[in-house]
Amino acid sequence: MKQEKLSLHDVLIRPIITEKALILREQRKYVFEVNPLANKNLVKEAVEKLFNVKVEKVNILNMKPKPKRRGIFEGKTRSWKKAVVTLKEGYTIKELEGEH
């Protein structure tokens, strides 16, 4: 499969704001929904350039669809890709700190 060239703004879709993600922030870990075509190198480059921080490592998870039902109608949630970005010591993403 040929990988398309993604711009840095297309790599990160949105930050994930959950109870678990807020606990991870204390360990310098930030969680993002990312483009399904993105890889670890693209995510690292995007976070470093967009937020002006240094990234230590990136973990990526493919989230599978979950079955859902509304009355007699059955369906699934969409599949998506999640990235957990660990920042180097002394760095935080100030734009995301005010959201909780």
UniProtKB/Swiss-Prot annotation:
Transmembrane segments: none annotated. The keyword Membrane does not apply. GO terms for biological process: translation. Pfam families: Ribosomal_L23. GO terms for cellular component: cytosolic large ribosomal subunit. GO terms for molecular function: rRNA binding; structural constituent of ribosome. Gene3D superfamilies: 3.30.70.330. Disulfide bonds: none annotated. InterPro entries: Nucleotide-bd_a/b_plait_sf, Ribosomal_uL23-like, Ribosomal_uL23/eL15/eS24_sf, Ribosomal_uL23_CS. The keyword Transmembrane does not apply. Keywords: Ribonucleoprotein, Ribosomal protein, RNA-binding, rRNA-binding. One of the early assembly proteins it binds 23S rRNA. One of the proteins that surrounds the polypeptide exit tunnel on the outside of the ribosome. Forms the main docking site for trigger factor binding to the ribosome. Belongs to the universal ribosomal protein uL23 family. Part of the 50S ribosomal subunit. Contacts protein L29, and trigger factor when it is bound to the ribosome. This is Large ribosomal subunit protein uL23.
